[in-house]
């Protein structure tokens, strides 16, 4: 190895390298010799060279294909160009990699978009399939039977007067028997009324709406389930010396009516207004569960400037604003509900009832108006009902509360199970031993074996509510409102009461079987 500098001149060379300046006269340049730095990989940069470092070069014969360098400057330029070329080549390689990666990313993005589109399409097809299955299930579960004229005549003994249980503007109603099953048969007062009621009842199913069984087009008759405890009006005034309703049953009935109205009003775009909510249009089943009827047909009777049939009975429950607007809205039903609440609380006739309750609240004498035949009303709950009832009966719609956000949030907690000490009041005030309504699943309408509380606050039989969820339905069976979640919480307290109740019914073999199943 030979050096291009003598030791005595090394420091001056280093200094000249650091300032990128060379004294050409100090180097004996031989054109036929190729000087190559031993540190060919540029391990050290110029800034890292300090005084005292030795820079070594190796003299080797130039290959024939390597051009001669006429000067040191041209040699250094070649080294610089070579380094620049390598950097440019690396940049080019990186740019090619970037282009490749971008192409791959674009490909993946297209594939993702196709996958999302395919997913959306499959989800749409799945939702349609679920909807069709639910519709088919509903059709199979709620089959509307067609009866002949002969069936109707046999069921009512040719519409015998003794079979008649009601006569209203909606038609004559009869107690009948079809295939050993008790039914309620209504002969519509007009063909138009018959067609409208059939159309409505085919669409609306709810635990607190009377169950529609079938029709007889020949005589414009509708067939419903039989509800043995008559209508709410008869129960309030104790017709035929019937037992008065307990305060607990009255509270439950208020909650059930409110729940049914929420269901009818739930679809804002196609909300169905009852329009004739009165105690006579609320029926009571064997378990003191209430069911509304004759809804959505008031437009056939109520026309502005005309006198509707049975005006005296309708007037106390009729929205005052209807007299000026001729229009019924969901707030019209809220007004009617308020009057019914006050009637159940006091047992008094509806006319001017709101004024009497308001006066009693103002003089702190509400306890004097409360119906004593209902048992010992919890005073705080009674006062809450009085206040919400008065609020509902505001003379103008602007003054009435919203059914969901202001009425239901007050009533719903009152419908919960009372303290254990007051549990006997689940029965009627006369000691009627019918099954308490709280024990009945609102879906299956049977005594619950495994009661579960859903996120809507209602208690259902576990199997029934899970089947409801399995159908892809995420709305409340009671209010038709969206459920916050599909979680279920065991109602162990209620299950304990049901178990105790069934034990008391042990002499009855049917209840013994029910008990063994729980």
UniProtKB/Swiss-Prot annotation:
Matching Pfam families: Pkinase, U-box, USP7_ICP0_bdg
Domain U-box: 434-508
Coiled coil segments of this chain: 86-142
CDD domains: RING-Ubox_WDSUB1-like
Keywords: Coiled coil, Transferase, Ubl conjugation pathway
InterPro entries attached to this UniProt entry: Kinase-like_dom_sf, Prot_kinase_dom, Tyr_kinase_AS, U-box_ubiquitin_ligases, Ubox_domain, USP7_ICP0-binding_dom, Znf_RING/FYVE/PHD
Function: Possesses E3 ubiquitin-protein ligase in vitro. May be involved in cell death signaling.
Protein name as annotated: U-box domain-containing protein 57
Source organism phylogeny: Eukaryota, Viridiplantae, Streptophyta, Embryophyta, Tracheophyta
């Amino acid at each position: 190895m030979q050096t291009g500098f003598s030791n005595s001149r090394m420091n001056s060379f280093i200094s000249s390298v650091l300032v990128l300046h060379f004294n050409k006269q100090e180097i004996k340049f031989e054109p036929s010799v190729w000087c190559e730095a031993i540190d060919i990989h540029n391990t050290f940069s110029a800034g890292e060279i300090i005084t005292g470092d030795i820079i070594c070069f190796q003299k080797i014969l130039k290959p024939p294909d390597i051009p001669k360098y006429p000067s040191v400057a041209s040699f250094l330029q070649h080294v610089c160009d070579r380094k620049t070329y390598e950097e440019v080549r690396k940049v080019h390689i990186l740019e090619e990699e970037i282009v490749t990666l971008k192409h791959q990313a674009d490909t993946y993005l297209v594939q993702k978009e196709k996958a999302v589109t395919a997913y959306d399409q499959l989800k749409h097809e799945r939702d349609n399939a679920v909807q069709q299955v639910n519709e088919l299930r509903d059709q199979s579960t709620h089959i509307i039977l067609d009866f002949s004229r002969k069936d109707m005549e046999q069921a009512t003994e040719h519409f015998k007067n003794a079979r008649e249980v009601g006569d209203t503007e909606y038609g004559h109603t009869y107690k009948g028997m079809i295939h050993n099953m008790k039914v309620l048969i209504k002969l519509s007062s007009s063909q138009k009324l018959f067609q409208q009621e059939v159309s409505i009842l085919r669409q609306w199913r709810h635990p607190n709406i009377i169950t529609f069984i079938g029709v007889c087009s020949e005589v414009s008759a509708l067939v419903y389930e039989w509800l043995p405890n008559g209508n709410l009006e008869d129960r309030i005034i104790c017709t035929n010396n019937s037992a008065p309703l307990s305060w607990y049953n009255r509270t439950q009935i208020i909650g059930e009516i409110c729940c049914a109205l929420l269901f009818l009003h739930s679809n804002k775009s196609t909300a169905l207004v009852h329009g004739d909510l009165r105690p006579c249009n609320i029926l009571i089943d064997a378990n003191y569960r209430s069911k509304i009827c004759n809804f959505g047909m008031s437009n056939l009777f109520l026309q502005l400037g005309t006198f509707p049939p049975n005006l005296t009975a309708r007037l106390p429950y009729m929205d005052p604003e209807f007299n000026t607007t001729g229009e019924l809205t969901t707030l019209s039903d809220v007004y009617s509900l308020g009057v019914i609440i006050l009637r159940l609380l006091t047992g008094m006739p509806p006319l001017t009832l709101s004024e009497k309750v308001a006066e009693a609240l103002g003089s702190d004498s509400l306890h004097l108006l409360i119906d004593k035949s209902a048992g010992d009303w919890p005073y705080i709950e009674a006062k809450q009902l009085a206040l919400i009832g008065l609020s509902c009966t505001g003379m103008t719609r602007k003054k009435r509360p919203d059914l969901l956000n202001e009425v239901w949030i007050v009533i719903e907690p009152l419908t919960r199970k009372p303290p254990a000490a007051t549990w006997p009041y689940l029965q009627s005030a006369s000691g009627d031993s019918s099954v308490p309504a709280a024990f009945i699943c609102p879906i299956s309408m049977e005594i619950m074996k495994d009661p579960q509380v859903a996120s809507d606050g209602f208690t259902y039989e576990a199997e029934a509510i899970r089947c409801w969820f399995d159908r892809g339905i995420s709305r409340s069976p009671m209010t038709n409102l969206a459920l916050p979640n599909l979680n279920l919480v065991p109602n162990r307290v209620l299950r304990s009461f049901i178990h105790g109740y069934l034990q008391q019914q042990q002499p009855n073999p049917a209840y013994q079987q029910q008990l063994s199943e729980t």
